[in-house]
Amino acid sequence: MAQLKVQQKKGVVGIKANQRETLRTLGLKRIGDVVVKEDRPEIRGMVNTVRHLVTVEEVE
């Protein structure tokens, strides 16, 4: 199954609370943090919520 590499590229100051919680749920705490998650619809939805704060790459 494919995986997604998600990296936080912007900080959380001044963003909405639900976006802040979504970053925490993904496991991102600070700028530059990287996590690898399974490519599932739930994860895609979370990434879509914070798409302006993260970069996403598909990895094998």
Curated annotation (Swiss-Prot):
Superkingdom, natural source: Bacteria
Membrane in keyword set: no
Residues making up the signal peptide according to the UniProt record: none
Pfam families the record matches: Ribosomal_L30
Biological process terms in GO annotation: translation
Organism: Nocardioides sp. (strain ATCC BAA-499 / JS614)
InterPro entries according to UniProt: Ribo_uL30_ferredoxin-like_sf (IPR036919), Ribosomal_uL30_bac-type (IPR005996), Ribosomal_uL30_ferredoxin-like (IPR016082)
Description of how the protein assembles with itself and partners: Part of the 50S ribosomal subunit.
S-S bonds: none
Keywords: Ribonucleoprotein, Ribosomal protein
Family membership noted in the UniProt record: Belongs to the universal ribosomal protein uL30 family.
SUPFAM superfamilies (alphabetical): Ribosomal protein L30p/L7e
PANTHER family the UniProt entry points to: LARGE RIBOSOMAL SUBUNIT PROTEIN UL30M, MITOCHONDRIAL RIBOSOMAL PROTEIN L30
Protein name, UniProt field: Large ribosomal subunit protein uL30
Lineage: Bacteria, Bacillati, Actinomycetota, Actinomycetes, Propionibacteriales
